[in-house]
A protein has these predicted regions:
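Transmembrane alpha-helical segments of polytopic membrane transport and secretion proteins
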Residues: 1-49, 293-301
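Transmembrane-helix boundary motif in ABC transporter permease subunits
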Residues: 101-133, 146, 154, 289, ...
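Interhelical loop and adjacent transmembrane-helix boundary motif
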Residues: 81, 85, 237-283
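Glycine/proline-centered hinge or cleavage motifs at structural transition points of membrane proteins
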Residues: 140, 199-200, 213
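C-terminal transmembrane helix and the adjacent membrane-cytosol boundary/short C-terminal tail
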Residues: 116, 120, 182, 186, ...
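Periplasmic/extracellular loop-to-transmembrane helix junction in inner-membrane transport proteins
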Residues: 22-45, 60-101, 122, 260, ...
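Generic hydrophobic transmembrane alpha-helix motif, especially the helices
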Residues: 134-172
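Transmembrane alpha-helices
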Residues: 180, 203-239
Length: 301
């Protein structure tokens, strides 16, 4: 009996404190209105600052890079010690190494995500795998570049090549694609699985015919975003791909991606016009992939 009385007293006192805190008196109403306006202004300023930073970066790159964009710049070859001419070989190298990296990364990441989400028994081993993936995702790209150089370039004897860069880039993208794909698979409603099991479907039939098609939109969005990030990587490619300006044909050929080309131009200061033009094209490509991912996300809903 005493416990119920104490509970009633505590509840009543809590209500009184809430009423006093939310007093509807004139002074309390003024204070609440003022605090609401202040916090609304703070939130709005934070949102505007974020947007303005992006707009400022885009405007700066466009203003400095757009005058140097031309057909010859996009489809021409760099010439001379000042890297005059175009950047076509760097575009080809970027597409080549990114495509190769995603071809390596995507199947492994999706299969691992399916295992973790659908087949693995939840326990310490699975938690350890997830922790390892999260830790791998947090490794700085320059560290991954050094690791790729030591393993693929030196130990495996692949040299500074497309395949060395693609393998290192795939390792960098693997945990990101795997974890987000796992979340996409887990987002598929359970009742869809239960309905399929109720009709006599096997585990593999449920996964291949129900779960993966239902999660395809989310998985595609994840892959597109990963491609956009891979295109913007520099440190990994700088240590594993080399700097040769040529059109790579074999995976064992070297090359120079756009990010490395931009880094060398800006770092040496030999041709800032070409650097700004390269930055503009690189930014446009990455923004295009981000917009495409956003389109896929909206289409899914």
């Amino acid at each position: 009996m005493s416990d119920s009385v104490d509970t009633t007293v505590d509840t009543t006192s809590s209500r009184e404190r809430i009423k006093r805190a939310l007093s509807h008196g004139k002074k309390g109403r003024i204070n609440k209105d003022l605090s609401n306006k202040i916090m609304l202004g703070v939130f709005r300023a934070a949102a505007y600052i974020t947007t303005l930073v992006l707009v400022a970066i885009i405007a700066y790159v466009v203003i400095n890079g757009l005058p140097h964009i031309s057909f010859d710049f996009i489809f021409g070859w760099p010439q001379g010690v000042n890297a005059e001419g175009g950047i076509w070989p760097t575009i080809v190298s970027t597409v080549y190494v990114t495509a190769l990296a995603m071809l390596i990364c995507t199947p492994i990441a999706v299969l691992a995500a399916v295992y973790l989400a659908e087949y693995a028994k939840q326990g310490k081993v699975v938690e350890l795998i997830r922790y390892a993936a999260d830790a791998l995702a947090s490794v700085p790209s320059i560290v991954m570049g050094l690791f790729g150089y030591a393993l693929f370039v030196e130990a495996m004897g692949l040299g500074l090549s497309m395949v060395s860069a693609a393998l290192a880039l795939a390792l960098l993208m693997l945990p990101i694609v795997m974890r987000t794909t796992e979340e996409a698979i887990r987002a598929v409603p359970r009742y869809i699985r239960w309905g399929a099991y109720g009709l006599g479907a096997t585990k593999w039939q449920v996964v291949s015919k129900i779960v993966l098609p239902s999660a395809f939109g989310r998985i595609a969005t994840v892959i597109v975003l990963a491609i956009g990030r891979a295109i913007g990587e520099t440190a990994v490619l700088l240590y594993t791909m080399g700097q040769a300006i040529n059109l790579p044909i074999s995976p064992l050929d070297s090359g120079r991606p756009m990010t490395v080309h931009l880094y060398l131009l800006a770092n040496d200061g030999i041709n800032m016009n070409a650097a700004y033009g390269t930055a503009l094209l690189l930014m446009a490509i990455i923004l295009a992939f981000n917009l495409f991912a956003r389109y896929l996300s909206r289409k899914r809903h």
